[in-house]
Structures are given as structure tokens and as C-alpha cells.
Amino acid sequence: MDILSDIKASVKGAPAPQQNPAAIKSENGNVDVSVSNEIHQQTAASTEELMSVSSLEQRTLHAEKFLYTEVIKSYLGERASTVISLLISLGRLTVREIYEKLNFTMSIDSIRRTLVSLTQLRCVRYLEEPKRGSAKYNTYYYYNKDGVYLLLYSGLIINDISSRFSEQKRPIVAEIIQNILSLGSLSLNDYLENVTYNIPKHEMSGLFVELCEMGFLVRLTKFDYTPIKDLWNLLYEKEYNQLPRNSTQSDLKKRTEAKNKAKTEFHNLMEASTDLSKLIKLDPSTSLRTVIPTATLTINIKRFLKSRRSLQLTNYARSRVGPVSAQLYKLALKLTENKAPYFNDILSETGLLQDLDELTAMSDEMELLEEKSPGVTFTANDILKIVPKNYKIENSLVYEKKSGKRSQNQEKSANTKRLKTEDGFVIPSLPTDNNHSNEKEIDDAEVEDGINEGDEMDADSVSIINSHLKILASSPVPFLKETQPNVYYIPYSNLIPELKSSIYDHIIVSTLGPPSLRIRRCIKENKLVSEKVINGTALMKEKDIRTTIGSLIKYNAVEIQEVPRTVDRSASRAVFLFRCNESHSYNFMKQNLAWNLANLLYKKEKIEDENKTLLMKANRDDVKGKERELLLPSELNQLKMVNERELNIFTRSFRLMSLWEVFEFF
């Protein structure tokens, strides 16, 4: 009996449920991925009218739903997209309920095969609950964002992880990650049985060990398929029911005690997948560390998002303190990336944030983890050890400004009278004693420099790096904080709000213009202002101010606050003030970016559908490489246009993703 079944049995008082074969595997015991071959199959017209995202109205109702369904459709096809759309719109459903909601247009077997593929790729979670008055169980399915994120970032994940290895290992690592992404999970034994590279097994096992130590691969457990809120509720009910009923404690104290115990057990269950001591062991035949061959491994999306956070902070530092300090800051982020805490406590996904005390406690705990966790602090010596050899930091600091005035020595040398012979030859001046002494000092110091050159260069490099770290720590934006003299850590809790604000301001400037940012900053600085105050501080025409405020209100960057002047709250005598609500503004911007990103995926799909025949012809084996000979000029022009539009869509998608992820994850 596993832990989850034990929890359910203790809560419900029922026997532990058996695993539903339709939840994970098909009838023959093998994982079914046949949904990927059904991309172009369509459902009935009534279902398509209900769930399709082809109309503008349906696409704008729920931006995240539009994005998730488009991502699923591009990878798994129309049927998988339809099922995910239902789960997002209606919440948890059983197979029978999905069958009824689709108006019986898909068979139950087809729905189960679709759910198997979605579950395998971590796009769906499930939970088994006992039926009332029966020993049978219902399996409820939920949509899971983690699988959608893995599909959306699949190319970037492969590129980011493989770039951390040497050139010889990059193709092998890229193949490992690609196989895990395409299958959802993979064990070491399964990969070694089908490996295409002719390398020793212990070297391949060493790559898996490195990926696990970096945090990119974690053990797949049953809790990865269990909804977080339901797991928390089961743990809480279990701890509450175990408290003695005849206790004299109040119900509030009992609930608090049960909550604290459930938190501890919840964290232990969530951290079990990242515990390397239970995943890596010594191989008795080679005495080398290896991953447990039967352990099922999957991609840790949170670890990858840490690297995306580091990239965003590096670009932000480059715009604030310059490229050299930003490069050293990038090394500091890379050094502490694996040990740094995640973006938020996983308990925030359980609904506990409805309590203000819980929110404050989580925020304080995150700030404490950023400073006190092992491996998150560093010094200049730590940075020097990982500085690339081809990266030069000498002469990267200017300690004092050069004066525009000429020195007295320069004036004297310029005013000295030069002697010439009859032929016009200039007689050089005689060397002074100072020149002789300087040359002698240089000659004497050459030997000492040869002996102590390495130590002096290291000392100078440490001093320069430490100066750059102090620049980052003393910046108005808190890129670093100093816990002890010359010991630093990265305060993510204070830094991420600054990053969000900077990117939001950049979007406002690029879309609505600089006057919009000026007025928004005026409102944000004064918190709650009237139009009269804005007219006096924004230094703009009154007509332009009203037009700009209207645009800001339209994009939810500024809100209107009604302040009544009378007791009866008469609208005719009320005053309307303006304010900025950052949480509302950021959420609106996130929805806007998500819709634009999904719309690009939708346009790409439409382009491929419109040119389906041409693309099939160009992708034939007998046509590849001979397009100019076998295709008509009009077909070549059309194919060129399709490639250019797809390339443009990919470029815009990556740019939108870099903006959207700041408001979605950070």
C-alpha cells in the first residue's frame, strides 16, 4: 500500500483503492501515444461550435485556455485539445462526464486513449474517489499546467540543458532530454536498451547522474499525477481525524495543530522526488555512482524556470549597471542557481493564501531561505573560479575621471625650446636622473614580476570582481545583498518586483508612448490623485493628459476611484480620483501576452492548413533537395512565403514568451 492510498484509507475509512488501468496504461499494458497520429481528425460540428477557438469571441473569453488548447493541439491533435478545453472550462470530470459533455461525438475508448497520452505527458492529473454507498471508485481528471509548460518550452529546455555540457556530450544530452520530453518520463534501463550512441554504459549513466545533480531530472512519483489541492485536503483531514475527540482544546487550536502537522508531511512528500540519496547509489561492479536503473525520471520544469529567471535578471542588470558587471552577475546566478529557492512555496497552490497570516509567514520564510539556505552565498573568490579564461576583466573599472586641464609637466615639456642644427636636425634632450632611475626600477622589477605575476593577477582579479559585486550591491535596484563583509546573496524577493515593474514600464512605453509612462509614474508616486494634481505635475497639456489617462484605463494600467463627498453618496457631488493597482495591471498584461502568444500559434496552424498540399509535396523524400527542379515557380514563391511567415511567427513567439513568463511564473 503506497502513501497516497494510506492517506485515503485513513480519511475515508475505506480499503486502499486499486490503480485504475485507464489512468496510466492502455489495455495491453503499454503506454499509448496514438493521439499524436490523430492531429487532423475532427469532431462533430456541434462539438466544434461549442469548444472551437477559431472565433474571436471564444478566443478572448479565456486567454490561458486559448493558449493551452493551442499548445496541446499543435503537439497532440484536435481530440486532445478538445478534452483539455473541457477540463479547463468545467473543472474535474470523469470519462463518462467527458463523453456526455461532448454530446457522444467521441467514443469512451477514444477518450481514454486521449487521457492516457495526456497523463503520460503530465498534461492531466487524476484522483480516485469512492462512490457513495459502493466499493467502486470514480476517477476524476484535472488539467495540469506543468505538461503544457514542458511542451511550450521543449526547444528551449533542450538547448539550455545541453549547452551546460561539453561539445562532445551535447548531442547525447540533447537526445536524452528529447526522449524524456516526448515520452513524459524515462528510466535509465529503458534508455540503455534503445541507445543509439556507441559509448560505454557507465559514461551514459554518468550523464544521468550529472543531470540529476543539476536538478533537471527528478524522480517521477504518484504525487506528480495527484492534484495539489486534493492532496492537501487529504493530508489535513487525516491529521485532523487523528486528534483525540475528547480533548479539551478548542476547535481552532485543533485545526491549527492539524494544519501544522499536514504542512510538515506535505513538504516531506513534495521533497521526496528531489532527494538524491534515494535516487543515486554506488554501482558495485564499477564503484561509480549511478542512478537507480528502474527509477522513472522526468524533467523538473521548476529547475528550468530558475535558469529563465537568471537570464531575465542578467538582462536587467546589463541595462542598469553595464555589460561587465552583468556578466559577473550571470556567473553568480549560475553558481547559486541550483540551490536557490523556487519562486514561491508550493503550499501557495493549496489555497492557504486566503489567510493573510499564512501569506505573511510564507513571504518571510522565502526571504529567510534566500539568505540562509546552504549554497546561496558566495564571495569574489567563488566567482573567480568559474570565470572563463577568454573573459578579460582588467581595466573594466574607472576609479577617477580624467581632468580636461593639462598638467604642469605637460605644459613645461610643451614649452621647452628645442635646438636644431644647420641641417634642421632636432637635438634630443638629455635624459634626466628620474628617467634613469625609472628604467633601473623597471629592470629590477621584471624578475620579481615573473615570480609573483600569477599571485598578483589573482589578487587583482579578486579585487576587480569584488568591486563589481559592490557596484551590484549598492545599485538602487538590489541585485545583491551583503550578509557579511565581501559575502553576498541574491535577494529574489526584493528583486523580482523591480524586474516586473521595469518590464511593465517598457511595454507601456513601447505601446502607448512615453507620456503614458510619465502619467502612470505620477499616479503611482502619489498613490491616489485627482486630475488637477496630474495637470500640475505631469507638465503636459490638459487635453493630452485626458487622452492618455483614457488609454491607460483601457489597458487597466490606471483605475478610477470614486470618493463621495456627502453622506448619501450622491454621484453628482462625488470626486473621481486615479490610482494604480499593480496586481490587476500585471494580471491584465499577462492575459494580454498569453492571448497574443496563442494567436501566433493559431496563425501558424492556419498557414499550415492553407498550404497543406504544398508542404506535403515539399517534404517528400524524392523532392527534398530538388525543389528548384521539381516545383513550379509559383510553388517556390509560395513555399518561400510560408517559410518566412513561420520564421517571423517563431521569432515573435520567443519574444512574447520572454515577456509573458515574467508575469506568469515570477
Swiss-Prot record:
Its main location: nucleus. Keywords: DNA-directed RNA polymerase, Nucleus, Transcription, Zinc. Residues 593-614 are annotated as: Leucine-zipper. GO terms for molecular function: DNA-directed RNA polymerase activity; single-stranded DNA binding. The keyword ATP-binding does not apply. InterPro entries: POLR3C_WHD, RNA_pol_III_RPC82-rel_HTH, RNA_pol_III_Rpc82_C, RPC3, WH-like_DNA-bd_sf. GO terms for biological process: termination of RNA polymerase III transcription; transcription initiation at RNA polymerase III promoter; tRNA transcription by RNA polymerase III. It is found in: Nucleus. It comes from the Eukaryota. GO terms for cellular component: RNA polymerase III complex. Belongs to the RNA polymerase beta chain family. Component of the RNA polymerase III (Pol III) complex consisting of 17 subunits. DNA-dependent RNA polymerase catalyzes the transcription of DNA into RNA using the four ribonucleoside triphosphates as substrates. Specific core component of RNA polymerase III which synthesizes small RNAs, such as 5S rRNA and tRNAs. This is DNA-directed RNA polymerase III subunit RPC3. It comes from Candida glabrata (strain ATCC 2001 / BCRC 20586 / JCM 3761 / NBRC 0622 / NRRL Y-65 / CBS 138). The lineage of its organism: Eukaryota, Fungi, Dikarya, Ascomycota, Saccharomycotina.
